[in-house]
Amino acid sequence: MNDQWYKHLIGARTIKTGIAIFLTAVFCMALDLTPIYAILTAVVTIEPTAKASLIKGYRRLPATVIGAGFAVLFTYLFGDQSPFTYALSATFTILFCTKLKLQVGTNVAVLTSLAMIPGIHDAYIFNFLSRTLTAIIGLVTSGLINFMVFPPKYYGQVEEKLSKTDALMYKLFYNRCQELILSRLQSDKSEKAYKNIFNLNNQVETLISYQRDELSYHKKKECDWKLLNQLTKRAYTNRLFITHLSNIIYLPKNTRVNFSGDEKMALLKISSSIKDIFYDGSFKREDDSVETLRSTIKALEISGENQIKSHILYEVLMIYRLLDSRYA
């Protein structure tokens, strides 16, 4: 059995959050400090990567200090029983965090500011310093836990999403070619499927960026970088495929395109060969069909007629070329 089964059951990030909360509470209690403010800071500081934790933590600390400062200031002016204290503390904290470009720390700063108001009483300086210290404890603890415990590995998620993207792309390309053969240039169904694929590929690229950040902060073997580069190249090819696919989905309204019998057969064979990649694991070349479409494009360029048709066939050939290179 996998010795890391618990990570699949709970989630590494959840485990790290729990550890960070526990250690933060231990440190604060050992120093006789109220742990709640440090825990709030620790919870929001756990990020997908160690780099993100360090960068955002660097901005959250001054934001928290700002929030604590305004809480003390307005409690001194209006007392802890006034609605103005809460409203002005939150408003000015948000305003200053925005002006100083500390937006990533706004949430924890506002929470800290509002939570500490009832306990300030007359100990203004002490509460300000203690809240600042607890914020530092929360930031440092969660940052170290995120860096040292269960360094994120997104390879599995990336490969899974890439495979899903491939399958959806190939299927949509096949279905879209069927629509074009039947002269259905506008298709809400294809547009919806395209948006789903586009969003899925964005998720892939986000995970790849997370993994690249993680590798840059940890000493990793050359094979890790090699695998990441392979996944990056695959995602880049998918991005190009999706771009060309969009160009045969989003076509001008009120246009008509008619294909000859040979052109329809060529589109059918090319789209079928691409759809079957997911099932066969290989790419069947359709050289004769490709040549048919190339000849049509050349003829249209000479005559200068039906540019939409030429555009569609060109995009189909570009998609074919991408996969021809991938499976060369």
Swiss-Prot record:
PANTHER family: ALUMINUM-ACTIVATED MALATE TRANSPORTER 10 (PTHR31086)
Name by which UniProt lists this protein: UPF0421 protein SAOUHSC_02103
Recorded topology in the membrane: Multi-pass membrane protein
Primary localization class, coarse: membrane
Keywords per UniProt: Cell membrane, Membrane, Transmembrane, Transmembrane helix
Transmembrane annotation, as ranges: 19-39, 61-81, 108-128, 132-152
Note: Disruption of this gene leads to an increase in hla (alpha-hemolysin) transcription and proteases production.
Domain of life: Bacteria
Subcellular location: Cell membrane
Pfam families registered for this protein in UniProt: ArAE_1
GO cellular component: plasma membrane
Organism: Staphylococcus aureus (strain NCTC 8325 / PS 47)
Family label: Belongs to the UPF0421 family.
InterPro entries: ArAE_1
